[in-house]
Amino acid sequence: MKISNLIYIFLFSITTSYAQTIPDFTGETADNKNIKIPDDLKGKYSLLCFASSQKAQTELESWLDPVYQKFIAKTGLMDDMYDVNIYFIPVLTGTNLSFAVSIKNKFKENTQEDLLPHVLFCNENGKDILTNLKMQKSDIPYFLLLDKDAKIIYRTSGGYTEEKFDAIDDLIE
């Protein structure tokens, strides 16, 4: 009985992940390009990386090098075959919204140039996005892999592990 319950819970979590759509929102990349989610993501796989606090940002940074090497710099032997939208999304909520312009400008000054197109600042209140995506803990980063139709096919949270990264890699055709 316990095993069948575990199987049911596992299958339910997979289906909810696959069935979920990303809510509509707009943003601007750190290199000033306007992006409309999910419309501008269709046609390619997309990895969206959300962080809504300093602590979450620290864990998100553990993902930067592997994601950068595989999908942005494409340094591996077979990495050229990957054509994936990558967006690191600092989620601003509450009083941080009033500092959005200064946060964005400071970020641009301190970020290497080839990462600027991959940093997306939301135009909407980040709290709504977090709520819609059921991202309840502000102290951990969240990662969503979207298929070519911009549907969520995988989600994870927390610091980088090879298992999480391999799961993402395996889902990208």
Language-model features and meaning:
Residues 138-173:
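Thiol-/selenol-based redox modules, centered on thioredoxin-like
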